Amino acid sequence: KEKKIDTSLDYTEGLKTYERNLQHVINLSLCNNIKVILGTYCIYLYPEIKDDPLHKLYQKIVLEENEVMRKLAAKNNLVLIDTASLISKEPTNFLDSIHFTSQGMSLLAQCFAEKINLE
């Protein structure tokens, strides 16, 4: 029997935990002189799923996670690579809603390589 996911559940505590955990990783990295570069998460709601309530909720949460990432980058004066904005949402870049094709992965690598080479 397939379980149904309740899309009305409150996920805000999860976002707080996400932010807290990321801040801990940032703190540990910086204390150990490890340079930190943050990146936003890409999601692509292709035509077959763009109106599905569960996928729309997942996208909403990912967008809020990306805001947390932006906030932490600003708070900690870190480089942020906004891949969610830099990589176009099109089938040539995504196998599904969250996994890149080889072309998409190349674009992701290029985004990070450019920033790493500048640092």
Label every PLM stretch briefly.
Residues 1-71, 75-76, 83, 88-91:
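Serine-dependent acyl-ester chemistry module
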Residues 18, 79, 93-119:
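Histidine-centered active-site loop/cap adjacent to the catalytic His
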